[in-house]
Amino acid sequence: MLYKGDTLYLDWLEDGIAELVFDAPGSVNKLDTATVASLGQALEVLEKQHDLKGLLLRSNKAAFIVGADITEFLSLFLVPEEQLSQWLHFANSVFNRLEDLPVPTLAAVNGYALGGGCECVLATDYRLATPDLRIGLPETKLGIMPGFGGSVRLPRMLGADSALEIIAAGKDVGAEHALKIGLVDGVVKQEKLIEGAIAVLRQAITGDLDWRAKRQPKLEPLKLSKIEAAMSFTIAKGMVAQTAGKHYPAPMTAVKTIEAAARFGREEALNLENKSFVPLAHTNEARALVGIFLNDQYVKGKAKKLTKDIETPKQAAVLGAGIMGGGIAYQSAWKGVPVIMKDINDKSLNLGMTEAAKLLNKQLERGKIDGLKLAGVISTIHPTLDYAGFDRVDVVVEAVVENPKVKKAVLAETEQKVRPETVLASNTSTIPIGELASALERPENFCGMHFFNPVHRMPLVEIIRGEKSSDETIAKVIAWASKMGKTPIVVNDCPGFFVNRVLFPYFAGFSQLLRDGADFRKVDKVMEKQFGWPMGPAYLLDVVGIDTAHHAQAVMAAGFPQRMQKEYRDAIDALFDANRFGQKNGLGFWRYKEDSKGKPKKEEDAAVDDLLASVSQPKRDFSDDEIIARMMIPMINEVVRCLEEGIIASPAEADMALVYGLGFPPFHGGAFRWLDTQGSAKYLDMAQQYQHLGPLYEVPEGLRNKARHNEPIIPRLNQPVRLVL
């Protein structure tokens, strides 16, 4: 053994060939700060071996290196810029030493090589991969850019266009594509990986392969003519501006850095990468996006822990077909859980099956499946008008009309048709689970399972724990949701649960703005372009359905009369009374017509102004900041109340529910991350300017207490990571 560290070791393999093996404690290798330091120490030993002929890098895990240790990132971002820059110089000196070894080097890459793992293998001369390879640089998705030489080496290896596509989009690619673009030099079966790697190294050692020529382009300026460079970078910047926009600075910074570094050799290019990386690491966007990643891991880990002793349902059922029922049935069948879809009439069943078939055909058109797979999946959805087969199902979700009487009747009837241990769930969006459970003989086997529309796209499923819901019931529904590829988040029962409970105060803020003379078009524009929502409130209401929102608004007002009971007729009432229900009938705040692809396209409709004038004061202008404040304060206050009341268990789960369920702008990181970025004291000052607007603008007492001491809601890291140089 030449060297033994905590996460890697160095040893002789055969005949002058050494192997550097990544073998961290635990299930995966990560390129954390300690591993970078250990790699430097291993190279120091290696550089003293005069009989060294070649070096093989490999992993003892199922994946090569899954990336940097993202749990270090938030504390790493606290490191002062000068110190962080120094550490990056050190880290890059380690990878440069690997690249500069006077012998051929090869990385035998199995499974994942992402982020720092990818940058590590880019420093070797050859890369041999297994068929399960996923390799790429996802850093821009975390608000940063490659910092270990990825933005320097990848363009010089692949050419500007392929490298820009991977780096700017934060992409990873599979083995076949990596081989095609030159990111790896060969693909071999896992059992032949080491044998093949040694064979390549031997050819390099004997001179049959020119490893020096392979290495040289990575040390030189990017080989592009002025015209080629202008075309590549102009197109890349245009694409990034269109897709990422101003709220996500990392992709554009990465493209501009690669462009600026193109005319330099390795050392100066790495300096430019360093100068770009460090400021990005200190942005609110980076903290927010890394926070989302960590929150996502926390939420999924919690779901896994809750279901560790639970068997995933093998047979499911959906009550109520139509678009929603068909979407749920499709998602279950697509992910391998056969489903019975029951309704009381053929028309609805046909609609549900048509929806499932439409979604499967889209997969076929995209080349994700073939006709055989399509037929196999659709055959596991069984439409029925009766309860045949319900004695074999493990879990049933009810998705009938949002009417408590109807839901109670359907659930009570179904309970008599299933086994005693079968779990029942309701896809209600606002009706308290306790109310629906009152119709059941076994309320402990019942909970809420709130899907978001469209089911196949929206990641979130709210799992609502009723007062009598058992832990096993909750775990079974979590297991099914996870199997369906969803992110389940458990919330406690109340009107609207979590997501809709905090959404309707946001809509109330919108209604008050319109009442006071705001133009809904400007509000939509500000909330989309400035704050970053995918849809402004008027557009969102049209998509949800004005009739649906009108009904839900009444449910919320009954549940929280002190805050959500209206004292005036608002814009939603006016549109509802005029039968303008949104996209579903082509008229809402906006007018909708089908585009060439059959999708609804919004257009202005002057008639709506006369309608809204009856519930609004004369038009007046509001600043962007005032619109954002008046829209967001009611939502943020309600989110805080939900945490204080135990409706949602943690800030992490609240933020992920809003990002995955409502499309809360990821660069803000969620409601609590946004609140902490503002600072609780600053937020309180802002909210107090609008408290005259009513109870929705009154800051909860718990948040007031934190504001007095300017305390964060998300626990704040006090210590930056200790960097080893």
Swiss-Prot record:
Substrate binds at residues 296, 500, 660. InterPro entries: 3-OHacyl-CoA_DH_CS, 3-OHacyl-CoA_DH_NAD-bd, 3HC_DH_C, 6-PGluconate_DH-like_C_sf, ClpP/crotonase-like_dom_sf, Enoyl-CoA_hyd/isom_CS, Enoyl-CoA_hydra/iso, FA_oxidation_alpha_subunit. Pathway: Lipid metabolism; fatty acid beta-oxidation. The record marks 119, 139 as: Important for catalytic activity. GO terms for biological process: fatty acid beta-oxidation. One of its GO terms (cellular component) is fatty acid beta-oxidation multienzyme complex. Its EC number is 4.2.1.17, 5.1.2.3, 5.3.3.8, 1.1.1.35. It catalyses: a (3S)-3-hydroxyacyl-CoA + NAD(+) = a 3-oxoacyl-CoA + NADH + H(+); a (3S)-3-hydroxyacyl-CoA = a (2E)-enoyl-CoA + H2O; a 4-saturated-(3S)-3-hydroxyacyl-CoA = a (3E)-enoyl-CoA + H2O; (3S)-3-hydroxybutanoyl-CoA = (3R)-3-hydroxybutanoyl-CoA. Keywords: Fatty acid metabolism, Isomerase, Lipid degradation, Lipid metabolism, Lyase, Multifunctional enzyme, NAD, Oxidoreductase. Residues 1-189 are annotated as: Enoyl-CoA hydratase/isomerase. One of its GO terms (molecular function) is NAD+ binding. The active site is at residue 450. PANTHER family: TRIFUNCTIONAL ENZYME SUBUNIT ALPHA (PTHR43612), TRIFUNCTIONAL ENZYME SUBUNIT ALPHA, MITOCHONDRIAL (PTHR43612:SF3). Involved in the aerobic and anaerobic degradation of long-chain fatty acids via beta-oxidation cycle. Catalyzes the formation of 3-oxoacyl-CoA from enoyl-CoA via L-3-hydroxyacyl-CoA. It can also use D-3-hydroxyacyl-CoA and cis-3-enoyl-CoA as substrate. Heterotetramer of two alpha chains (FadB) and two beta chains (FadA). HAMAP family: FadB. This is Fatty acid oxidation complex subunit alpha. It comes from Salmonella paratyphi A (strain AKU_12601).
